[in-house]
Every structure is written in C-alpha cells, then in structure tokens.
UniProtKB/Swiss-Prot annotation:
Record's catalysed reaction(s): N(6)-[(R)-S(8)-aminomethyldihydrolipoyl]-L-lysyl-[protein] + (6S)-5,6,7,8-tetrahydrofolate = N(6)-[(R)-dihydrolipoyl]-L-lysyl-[protein] + (6R)-5,10-methylene-5,6,7,8-tetrahydrofolate + NH4(+)
Protein family per UniProt: Belongs to the GcvT family.
GO molecular-function terms, A-Z: aminomethyltransferase activity; transaminase activity
EC number: 2.1.2.10
PANTHER family: AMINOMETHYLTRANSFERASE (PTHR43757), AMINOMETHYLTRANSFERASE, MITOCHONDRIAL (PTHR43757:SF2)
Enzyme class, broadest EC rank: transferase
Protein name in UniProt: Aminomethyltransferase
GO biological process: glycine decarboxylation via glycine cleavage system
Complex formation: The glycine cleavage system is composed of four proteins: P, T, L and H.
UniProt GO cellular component terms: cytosol; glycine cleavage complex
The keyword Transferase is assigned to this record: yes
InterPro entries (alphabetical): GCS_T, GCS_T_bac, GCST_C, GCV_T_N, GcvT/YgfZ/DmdA, GcvT/YgfZ_C, TrmE/GcvT_dom1
Keyword list, A-Z: Aminotransferase, Transferase
Provenance organism: Salmonella arizonae (strain ATCC BAA-731 / CDC346-86 / RSK2980)
C-alpha cells in the first residue's frame, strides 16, 4: 500500500491525478502539466515534497563524520544556515544519493535526502555514524512544500509572521533558517528562485490552502520533471546511481579534492577514474520535430575518427523553449553535434552544456 503525505486530501480537493511514486501517492498533475510548468517559470507554483526525508544529526563529532561521509566538504559551512549540495558515495565511487546538508551549530546538521533512496540512505548513514556517536533523528513529523518561481518568495511571504519575514529578508540562495514553526530554505529543483518550507505535519494542509489563496499554483511531478530537466538538474536513478560516478554525472564540482589529506568514502576510486578518464554528462538540443526520450542511443565520431555511443538519461519536450532537450551520458571527446536514433530515423542534435533554462531564460 502506497504511503500518503499529510497533503494527500488537499491534492484530491485540487483535482490531482495521483500516481504511485516510489511507494508514495503523489500528484502527477492537476489538469494541465503545461500550465503548471509555465506558472513556475512566469509566476509561482508549489510542490508537495513531503515524501523526501529530513534527517537531523546531533553530536560533537557531526562535522567530522560528514567530512568522511560526503564527497563535498562541510568544512566550507561556517555560516549558520548555510547549505551544501553533495553526493553520498560508495567505496567504488558510485552515487548512493545526492542530498543537501545544512549547518546550524557544531553539533547540529540537517540532511534532506531523496524518497526513493530513503531506506538505503538511512542504513548507510546509521552504519557509518556509529563510531562518531551521532544521534540520528528522522523528521517524519515535518511536511515539506516547495514554492518556486519569480513571484514565489513574495507570495509565500504573505503567509509569514513578522519574525519569519525578518528572518528571510536578504537571505541568499542555499541558506535555511528556523523561524517560529517554519524552516525556510532558499533552495529548489526548478532553476527559479523560491523557498522550500518545512513545517509540522498538522500545519501543512492550512498552509497549502493559504498558498492557493495567495495565488500559488499547485504543481505535480510532471511539471517538476520538465522544470528540473530544463534547469539541468540530475534525477537520482537516471543521471546517477550506485554504478555511476559523480564525474560522469556533471557532479565533479561537488567533489572537494582539497585538502588532499581528507579521506572520504569513494575518494580513492574517484582519483583513479579522474586519472584514467571517464564518461561525461552533456546537454542535447533537437529543434526538429520529435522528442528525445530516455535510453535512446547517442552516436558521434570522435576526433580520432572512432564511432562512439552514449545514452540519453533524461529527455523531454521543453515547454519553455518549444523544442526537445535531453541530458546524455557519453564517452569523452564528443564534439558540437551528434546523432540520436528515434525509431528508424537518425536525427541530428546539437551538443550543449547540461543546462538549458535559468530564471526563465534560455541558456543553451
């Protein structure tokens, strides 16, 4: 039986088409995925992301533990509320999960991890935390709503108390603050400004209804996927998994190689991959008719004249751009063009950086 978030009833009242998403009943859309997508790019939309797992870590050695657990280095986190994006890797350098870590005090950090990987994440964290005497608290008492879009922060702020408005005023991206009963973070998965707001489960339904009244459009998983793909953001299980290195998933920037004496899980394997060479994640654009889909082959000829083949990890029609885009994992050495086999047709595609839209504007 699929689980329900505390907002399940609100979704049905808003006319959602519900689907089973990794064991959770979640809204796919509320009538028009396209309208929801455009609302986030031009105004404000919101997503129920309560299926994600919030994990609080307490203990005097928490920073030391996270410097070993994560490929990125929490030594960078010195300001209260600052957040960091990182991969959590296995010994062979594969990605167990990608997550966000927040720093509050030396003995209090918070992780937000994916729903599909919840059980293995918690088992892995618990296993490696034991020598550090870390107290692990899974915050199933909290719901999480993402409010995204150019007008999202302004509309969300109409629900805040004066204390909460003061707390978030001037807050830069990738920070979080606990203000009253809300945890408000300037993070998201759309390429737009906004907040991800955690609150007690019993407050979630009222907060959702108030956002609707403030003119924030409910959005489902469908729009969430097209928005994150336009923004060039990875989806666990597609761009990366336990068999795929962050180096092959455009996550090289999340690996903190310095200081060289910091040992983290997967470091040795990554250093070998970096030396030998590895696949890369690129963007693809196809302006001709048709849609680039997951798992289609991508072929190109490298500089040595060798035929090479990669694979599309995520592909869709981009509502913002009006043509098809994709992320693809390919051997190193790809040029500016490639060929994608769509049914029995060989379609030319342009190779770009793996990001297409930022703050509503085309970048590809």
């Amino acid at each position: 039986m699929a689980q329900q978030t505390p907002l399940y009833e609100q979704h049905t009242l808003c006319g959602a088409r519900m689907v089973d998403f990794h064991g959770w009943m979640m809204p796919l859309h509320y009538g028009s995925q396209l309208d929801e997508h455009h609302a986030v790019r031009t105004d404000a939309g919101m997503f129920d992301v309560s299926h994600m797992t919030i994990v609080d870590l307490h203990g005097s050695r928490t920073r030391e533990f996270l410097r070993y657990l994560l490929a990125n280095d929490v030594a960078k986190l010195t300001k209260t509320g600052k957040a960091l994006y990182s991969g959590m890797l296995n010994a062979s350098g594969g990605v167990i999960d990608d997550l966000i870590v927040y720093y509050f005090t030396e003995d209090f950090f918070r992780l937000v991890v994916n729903s599909a990987t919840r059980e293995k994440d918690l088992a892995w964290i618990t296993q490696h935390a034991e020598p550090y005497a870390i107290d692990i608290t899974v915050r199933d008492d909290l719901s999480l709503i993402a409010v995204q879009g150019p007008n999202a922060q302004e509309k969300a702020a109409t629900l805040f108390t004066e204390e909460q408005r003061n707390a978030v005023e001037g807050m830069k991206p990738f920070f979080g603050v606990q203000a009253g009963d809300l945890f408000i973070a300037t993070t998201g998965y759309t390429g737009e400004a906004g907040y991800e707001i955690a609150m007690p489960n019993e407050k979630a339904a009222d907060f959702w209804r108030a956002l609707v009244e403030a003119g924030v459009k409910p959005c489902g998983l469908g729009a969430r996927d097209t928005l994150r793909l336009e923004a060039g953001m990875n989806l666990y299980g597609q761009e990366m998994d336990e068999g795929i290195s962050p180096l092959a998933a455009n996550m090289g920037w999340t690996i903190a190689w310095e200081p060289t004496d910091r040992d983290f899980i997967g470091r040795e394997a990554l250093e070998m991959q970096r030396e030998k060479g590895h696949e890369q994640l690129v963007g693809l654009v196809m302006t001709e008719k048709g849609v680039l889909r997951n798992e289609l082959p991508v072929r190109f000829t490298d500089a040595q004249g060798n035929q090479q083949e990669g694979i599309i990890t995520s592909g869709t029609f981009s509502p913002t751009l009006g043509y098809s885009i994709a992320l693809a994992r390919v051997p190193a050495g790809i040029g500016e063009t490639a060929i994608v086999q769509i049914r029995n047709r060989e379609m030319p595609v342009k190779v770009t950086k793996p990001v297409f839209v930022r703050n509503g504007k085309a970048v590809a």
